[in-house]
């Protein structure tokens, strides 16, 4: 009998407890989708049910058959070629008008046209969900516990608020970190934190700091003007809606939440209790940034092997390289080939729709990596300790290569002016100079030396939000302040008034005393 009980207990322990939840994914495109797809696969392994909203004109999302993965397809008034056109225009505009101190204004004007088209597509994607009452009713009945989105593709937050569920962001960057700074309330001191897309490092000269300061404020202005149209859309979508989202309040023995530097970790005893702490009065106008600021957790797709040290907030988690994995053995011959398998294909040859870059970088004979500077490719090179020759093209790629150059793991070649001699020289440099390989291996050791793997951290925080109905105890009070309170302008103004008043009174007293003593002196002389 005892043996049977022990055997039954062992079986129960092996089976484990199924705590599968329901996760909703807002649609996204390009590398944004590829990164979130990795997280989706891991959530499914942990027996969660995942539903992905898919516009009928989606370019990258391909529905597959999986009992734990549902693709909710809805109609939009455009096809795949529309999104493909927007992406193509974005790349070409950037290549033809790469921003520099002398071309930044023209770049802004040209990019504004592309972003306007992108916003039109995004609003049609939003309308396809928000104006589809049947779909919204179905989503409400599904009892989702969290929504995962990317702030580059708006409206996921609106859907989450309408469904009354918490939402999270997966984000690589925003230009000059404008979204993280103004919506997420992360401090970005321009004196030592380089603006994203500035191609600067944290070691800045006086001239660099001037350039960095201008870059921050210029890109803030661009964000304000290019994304302003979303404020009215958000107000209209959320207008008249009374929101009541479950949150958490926390009492910590170390006090209130505050920004931390990478070298600091918080250890604290928390006493948590559930509360209902957020209400949007009916009809009150809101903004895109205010709504984004309600995200429970921000999963930032970089890490300190890539980033320069800077302050961050407790609800920002760095998960760079979450897609990286050990290399698989490779065949003798790799062939990127689409179509019917050739009848004469040799046994030593394997066909691929897409060359397995990660496996190639992990091969022991790989000496260098020629890359355009995409974040995913750079992280695979870091993971396997491979030095790089960067040929950046657009978006964050020049900035990424600047980071790798500063860390001594890459050499850059200019796409517009390079020759075969330049490329060969760069390759010989990273292959023959030991410092590049040593620095690449140092970054690799840093990346691998983490207490929890990036993918596991990302999944943990999604499950954390599901378990606790949010993460309000990690939300800083900065979100509750007006802009002049946040910058302490009211306090500075009050102190200036006090100092000015004190100086005025002292001067008046001095003048009064001088006049008084002057009259007494004159009176004595007369006497």
Swiss-Prot record:
GO molecular function: glucuronosyltransferase activity
Short name of one Pfam family: UDPGT
Tissue occurrence: Olfactory epithelium, brain and fetal lung. Not present in liver.
Compartments where found: Membrane; Endoplasmic reticulum membrane
GO cellular component annotations of the record: endoplasmic reticulum membrane
Membrane topology: Single-pass type I membrane protein; Single-pass membrane protein
Signal peptide: 1-20
Keyword vocabulary terms for this entry: Endoplasmic reticulum, Glycoprotein, Glycosyltransferase, Lipid metabolism, Membrane, Olfaction, Sensory transduction, Signal, Transferase, Transmembrane, Transmembrane helix
GO biological process: bile acid metabolic process; response to symbiont; sensory perception of chemical stimulus; sensory perception of smell; xenobiotic metabolic process
Domain of life: Eukaryota
CDD domains: GT1_Gtf-like
Glycosylated residues, chain numbering: 49, 347
Intervals, Cytoplasmic compartment: 513-527
Lumenal side: 21-491
Enzymatic reactions: glucuronate acceptor + UDP-alpha-D-glucuronate = acceptor beta-D-glucuronoside + UDP + H(+); 16beta,17beta-estriol + UDP-alpha-D-glucuronate = 16beta,17beta-estriol 16-O-(beta-D-glucuronate) + UDP + H(+); 16alpha,17alpha-estriol + UDP-alpha-D-glucuronate = 16alpha,17alpha-estriol 16-O-(beta-D-glucuronate) + UDP + H(+); 17alpha-estradiol + UDP-alpha-D-glucuronate = 17alpha-estradiol 17-O-(beta-D-glucuronate) + UDP + H(+)
InterPro entries, per the entry: UDP-glycosyltransferase, UDP_glucos_trans, UDP_glycos_trans_CS
Entry-linked Gene3D superfamilies: Glycogen Phosphorylase B
EC number, as in UniProt: 2.4.1.17
Residues annotated as transmembrane: 492-512
Family under the similarity heading: Belongs to the UDP-glycosyltransferase family.
Function: UDP-glucuronosyltransferase (UGT) that catalyzes phase II biotransformation reactions in which lipophilic substrates are conjugated with glucuronic acid to increase the metabolite's water solubility, thereby facilitating excretion into either the urine or bile. Essential for the elimination and detoxification of drugs, xenobiotics and endogenous compounds. Catalyzes the glucuronidation of endogenous steroid hormones such as androgens (testosterone and epitestosterone) and estrogens (estradiol and epiestriol).
Note: UGT2A1 isoform is part of the UGT2A complex locus which displays alternative use of promoters and exons. The locus is defined by 2 alternative promoters giving rise to 2 functionally active polypeptides UGT2A1 and UGT2A2. Alternative splicing of exons results in additional isoforms for each protein class.
Protein name as annotated: UDP-glucuronosyltransferase 2A1
Organism of provenance: Homo sapiens (Human)
């Amino acid at each position: 009998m005892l043996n049977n009980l022990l055997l039954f207990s062992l079986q129960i322990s092996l089976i484990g407890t199924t705590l599968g939840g329901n996760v909703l994914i807002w649609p996204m495109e390009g590398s944004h989708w590829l990164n979130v797809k990795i997280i989706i696969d891991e959530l499914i392994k942990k027996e969660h049910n995942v539903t992905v909203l898919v516009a009928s004109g989606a370019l990258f999302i391909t529905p597959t058959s999986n009992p734990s993965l549902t693709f909710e397809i809805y109609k939009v008034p455009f096809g795949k070629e529309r999104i493909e056109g927007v992406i193509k225009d974005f790349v070409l505009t950037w290549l033809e008008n790469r921003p520099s101190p002398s071309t930044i204004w023209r770049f802004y004007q040209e990019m504004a046209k592309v972003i306007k088209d992108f916003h039109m597509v995004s609003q049609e994607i939003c309308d396809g969900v928000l104006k589809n009452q049947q779909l919204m009713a179905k989503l409400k009945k599904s009892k989702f516990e969290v929504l995962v989105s990317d702030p580059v593709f708006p409206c996921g937050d609106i859907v989450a608020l309408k469904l009354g569920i918490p939402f999270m962001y997966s984000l690589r960057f925003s230009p000059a970190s404008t979204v993280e700074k103004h919506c997420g309330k992360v401090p970005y001191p321009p004196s030592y934190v380089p603006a994203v897309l500035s191609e600067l490092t944290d070691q800045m000269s006086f001239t660099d700091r001037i350039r960095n300061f201008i870059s921050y404020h210029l890109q803030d202005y661009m964000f304000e003007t290019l994304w302003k149209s979303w404020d009215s859309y958000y107000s209209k979508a959320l207008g008249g809606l009374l929101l009541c989202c479950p949150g958490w309040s926390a009492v910590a023995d170390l006090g209130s939440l505050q920004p931390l530097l990478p070298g600091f970790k918080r250890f604290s005893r928390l006493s948590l209790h559930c509360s209902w702490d957020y209400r949007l009065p009916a009809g009150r106008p809101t903004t895109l940034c205010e709504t984004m600021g309600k995200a429970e957790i921000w999963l930032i797709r970089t890490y300190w092997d890539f980033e320069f040290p800077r302050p961050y907030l407790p609800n920002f988690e760095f998960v760079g390289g979450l897609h990286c994995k050990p290399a698989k053995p490779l065949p003798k011959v790799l062939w990127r080939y689409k179509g019917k398998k050739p009848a004469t294909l040799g046994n030593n040859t394997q066909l691929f729709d897409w060359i397995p870059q990660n496996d190639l970088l992990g091969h022991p004979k790989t000496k260098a990596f020629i890359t355009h500077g995409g974040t995913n490719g750079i992280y695979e090179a870091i993971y396997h300790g491979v030095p790089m020759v960067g040929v950046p093209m657009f978006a964050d790629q020049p900035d990424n290569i600047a980071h790798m150059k500063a860390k001594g793991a890459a050499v850059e070649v200019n796409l517009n002016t390079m020759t075969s001699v330049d490329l060969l020289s760069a390759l010989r440099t990273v292959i023959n100079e030991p410092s590049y390989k040593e620095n690449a291996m140092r970054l690799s050791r840093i990346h691998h030396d983490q207490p929890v793997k990036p993918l596991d951290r990302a999944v943990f925080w999604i499950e954390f939000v599901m378990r606790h109905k949010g993460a309000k105890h990690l939300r800083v009070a900065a979100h509750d302040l007006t802009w002049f309170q946040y910058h302490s302008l009211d306090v500075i103004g009050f102190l200036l008034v006090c100092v000015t008043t004190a100086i005025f009174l002292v001067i008046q007293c001095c003048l009064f005393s001088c006049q008084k003593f002057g009259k007494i002196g004159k009176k004595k002389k007369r006497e």
